[in-house]
A protein has these predicted regions:
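Membrane-interface anchor segments at the N-terminal boundary of transmembrane helices
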Residues: 62-67, 302-393
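Membrane-interface alpha helices of multi-pass inner-membrane proteins
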Residues: 16, 143-159, 170, 191-198
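Extracytoplasmic catalytic/substrate-binding loops of multi-pass membrane glycan-assembly enzymes
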Residues: 21-35, 42-54, 58, 62-66, ...
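Specific aromatic-rich, kink-prone transmembrane helix
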Residues: 39, 82, 118-136, 147-152, ...
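Membrane-proximal stem/loop segments at transmembrane-domain junctions that anchor or position
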Residues: 211-334
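Transmembrane-helix motifs of polytopic, lipid-linked glycan transferases
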Residues: 70-90, 120, 124
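Transmembrane signal-anchor helices characteristic of membrane glycosylation enzymes that use polyprenol
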Residues: 3-26, 101, 193-206, 451-463
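Aromatic- and kink-enriched transmembrane "portal" helix at the membrane-lumen/periplasm boundary
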Residues: 20, 49-52, 56, 61-65, ...
Length: 473
């Protein structure tokens, strides 16, 4: 079947090029923190414990980031190979291979981040679930099932705050095994299984590994309470002076002017927001949300709109500059020909087509994919495209709860899931996208028109919260 298909070598080439370009594995301060935990075997939950524990096991073979680099790059390119083999007989299936080399996917594929593990692992699980066919040898089916369970258990706990995305992909996975079961039963099974995944993860983290519990949620609660403090005209956090809150308002941190005020307080040296009492912060936040519900909604929408930005603005963080940040752990990285080439490749696209690194572009693109997939849900019986697109939207939209700057990793899965949702749609679509829109019913045409206008003109109607105006009031 595959004779005369030299393109089958492309995923292998992509794997080798990725390993070479990112060798020994790019590392930011977050990566270095996790590696330090893996070395010392002293874990805390500020970063996913399961990832640090896996790293500590890899260190028994080869110390450093290289084993983790191989792990995450292999998950991605193995997923590409599996999907391509399953869709090789489709017209234009080569599109799948070509788009797998997209700069917005490759640019951070070799950075040792939980976000990359999450995205590569999810894509591999989707690939395994797609068009599932059982092996003739029963033992092989058992091995595949076992590996899939371990994989989904890992990715569910490597980014546990994305539980809605996990729930959707879990449904896709369960559906691939239980196609004859009613939808309601599969939804219930997915929900129970997802809860079980997180339950096992919590038990492993705090009972088996005995990881130290941190208060990362404090950062977002402090941001909320700074906003409410400005509304009230006094500090709602007794440990933080009101004047210090006001002093941090004009600062632009990671291109954000609304979120990340806590970071300004921390770098001042006077405060450590993670040491504040979480329960007290939470109680005060709840009271203020009840008192100022509309103001809180407006603030969150404004901050989310600021995070989304515009699709013509060049993203500030789509490449880990320097490869490996300076450290005392003895890890160094030197650019080679492939590193330099990949950076130039990413830089060129980020300059000429900046929208491919924009959260706004992937938010709206995922909505386009959802609408197209929904129209074809009776044809695509597995609903793979629809589930991928929905997960892409939810992954991006969850940043409304609180996010850093528009760092590409924070919507990496959204970019990957949307891309492969559209690829699968194209492979299964007998007509062009223009034909799909043309033959849509009136409500769908209206939706397309509104979506296009909003996308082109970037009408951000909620982006009007200004801290300085609030102070003047």
């Amino acid at each position: 079947m595959y004779k005369g298909k030299p393109q089958l070598l492309l995923p292998i080439m992509g794997w080798a090029l990725s390993i070479t370009a990112f060798y020994p594995g790019f590392m930011s301060p977050d990566s270095l923190n996790q590696y330090s935990q893996a070395l010392n075997k002293s874990f805390n939950d500020h970063h996913p414990v399961v990832m640090a524990v896996l790293w500590s096991e890899f260190n028994k073979l080869v110390s450093g980031p290289f084993p983790m680099l191989i792990f995450q790059v292999t998950m991605y390119w193995l997923a590409i190979g599996i999907i391509y083999l399953k869709k090789i007989e489709k017209n234009n299936s080569i599109i799948l291979i070509l788009l797998s080399f997209s700069p917005f996917i490759l640019s951070i594929l070799g950075v040792i981040w939980k976000d990359v593990h999450f995205a590569a692992g999810l894509l591999l699980l989707v690939a395994s679930s797609l068009d599932r066919k059982k092996f003739k040898i029963r033992f092989l089916n058992i091995i595949v099932l076992t590996l899939e369970v371990l994989l989904i258990l890992y990715i569910a706990n490597v980014r546990g705050n994305s539980w809605l995305v996990i729930l959707l992909i879990t449904y896709l996975w369960i559906n691939s095994y239980l196609k004859s079961v009613t939808t309601l039963k599969k939804i219930c099974a997915s929900l129970i299984f997802t809860i079980g995944l997180f339950g096992v993860g919590q038990y492993f983290t705090y009972q088996v590994v005995k990881a130290k519990q941190t208060s990362i949620v404090n950062d977002y609660l402090v941001d909320n309470l700074i906003y409410f403090s400005i509304l009230e005209g006094e500090s709602l956090i007794p440990e933080i002076e009101y004047d210090d809150m006001v002093a941090c308002l004009p600062a632009t941190i990671a291109e954000m002017k609304l979120n990340l005020r806590f970071f300004c307080l921390n770098i001042s040296g006077k405060y450590n927001t993670s040491s504040l009492n979480t329960d007290q912060l939470l109680d005060e936040s709840k009271q203020m949300i009840v008192k100022h519900p509309w103001a809180f909604i407006k603030y969150k929408l404004a901050a989310f709109s600021e995070f989304q930005g515009t699709f013509w603005h060049k993203n500030y963080y789509y490449w880990q500059t320097g490869g490996v940040d300076s450290n005392t752990l003895g890890i160094e990285q030197t650019d080679n020909f492939f590193t330099i080439s990949l950076k130039k490749y990413s830089d060129t696209f980020a300059t000429l087509l900046p929208f491919v690194f924009s959260p706004l572009f992937w938010l709206w693109s995922s909505l386009v994919a959802v609408t197209l997939s929904w129209r074809r849900r009776n044809i695509d019986t597995e609903n793979v495209s629809l589930i991928l697109a929905a997960s892409a939207f939810l992954y991006n939209f969850q940043n409304i709860l609180g996010a850093g700057g528009p760092d590409f990793r924070y919507f990496y899965w959204s970019a990957i899931a949307t891309t492969f949702s559209m690829i699968l749609l194209k492979l299964n679509m007998p007509h062009s996208l223009a034909h799909e829109i043309k033959t849509s019913s009136a409500p769908w045409k209206f939706f397309w028109i509104v979506l296009t206008i909003v996308f082109i003109f970037q009408v951000q109607i909620f982006h009007h919260v200004n801290y300085l105006d609030l102070i003047q009031k």
